[in-house]
Amino acid sequence: MTYHLDVVSAEKKMFSGVVQKIQVTGSEGELGIFPGHAPLLTAIKPGMIRIVKQFGEEEFIYLSGGILEVQPSVVIVLADTAIRGLDLDEARALESKRKAEAHINNSHGDVDYAQASAELAKAIAKLRVIELTKKAM
């Protein structure tokens, strides 16, 4: 069984097609969306979406956050920012991770620490998408 998936960012439509399942990080944890899933509307945390297409091929897209809407035959991901794994720059992601770690070590106060932690989580998520995209090739 399959369903239709649309992944849309503020800039463009990143994916539109028939899929077997997706995996994404919601506000309450990891979500696996299979055909016939109960209707759902939830926030998406920064991380990745793993798409298993109709014939088993996988694609990985980095999401900076957004909204997931699940209906019986259609799933829509409205992302703040979405970047395909192939389009991510590994050197840039490593540099972002290094800067965020330095910021955490030098943070002064809760707001500084929270902001640095969020930046670190985004950098780690990008690196994970890059790693999984390389493995899938």
Swiss-Prot record:
One Gene Ontology term, aspect cellular component: proton-transporting ATP synthase complex
Major subcellular location class: membrane
Lipid bilayer topology: Peripheral membrane protein
Gene Ontology MF terms: ATP binding; proton-transporting ATP synthase activity, rotational mechanism
Cell membrane keyword on record: yes
Family according to the record: Belongs to the ATPase epsilon chain family.
Subunit composition and interactions: F-type ATPases have 2 components, CF(1) - the catalytic core - and CF(0) - the membrane proton channel. CF(1) has five subunits: alpha(3), beta(3), gamma(1), delta(1), epsilon(1). CF(0) has three main subunits: a, b and c.
Protein name in the entry: ATP synthase epsilon chain
Organism expressing this protein natively: Yersinia pestis (strain Pestoides F)
Gene name of the record: atpC
